[in-house]
UniProtKB/Swiss-Prot annotation:
A zinc finger (C4-type) spans 39-60. Component of the large ribosomal subunit (LSU). Mature yeast ribosomes consist of a small (40S) and a large (60S) subunit. The 40S small subunit contains 1 molecule of ribosomal RNA (18S rRNA) and 33 different proteins (encoded by 57 genes). The large 60S subunit contains 3 rRNA molecules (25S, 5.8S and 5S rRNA) and 46 different proteins (encoded by 81 genes). NCBIfam families: eL43_euk_arch, PRK03976.1. Keywords: Cytoplasm, Metal-binding, Phosphoprotein, Ribonucleoprotein, Ribosomal protein, Zinc, Zinc-finger. The modification Phosphoserine is found at residue 40. It comes from Saccharomyces cerevisiae (strain ATCC 204508 / S288c) (Baker's yeast). One of its GO terms (biological process) is cytoplasmic translation. The lineage of its organism: Eukaryota, Fungi, Dikarya, Ascomycota, Saccharomycotina. This is Large ribosomal subunit protein eL43A. Present with 44600 molecules/cell in log phase SD medium. PANTHER family: 60S RIBOSOMAL PROTEIN L37A, LARGE RIBOSOMAL SUBUNIT PROTEIN EL43.
């Protein structure tokens, strides 16, 4: 089957509606949310989005809470590093 879109990709379903800049933003989000991610438990690239913020590994069947469009957010990474730093300060 021939490739039908070059620029618009997944947002071709919206046609000419909503404006190009909004469709460009939505394209970025929809590519992220439909992508497969690496599982932090089994290491395979099998994590998919089940609902907003719910990510499930189809291999090991683990369910993880994450961001709405990606498994890990920048805020979550900051919190993890802060918790790790505070834990090291308490132990030392």
């Amino acid at each position: 089957m021939a490739k039908r879109t070059k620029k618009v990709g997944i947002t071709g379903k919206y046609g000419v509606r909503y404006g190009s800049s909004l469709r460009r933003q939505v394209k970025k989000l929809e590519i992220q949310q439909h992508a497969r991610y690496d599982c932090s438990f089994c290491g395979k690239k099998t994590v998919k989005r089940g609902a907003a913020g719910i990510w499930t590994c189809s291999c090991c069947k683990k369910t993880v809470a994450g961001g709405a469009y990606t498994v890990s957010t920048a805020a979550a990474a900051t919190v993890r590093s802060t918790i790790r730093r505070l834990r090291e300060m308490v132990e030392a």
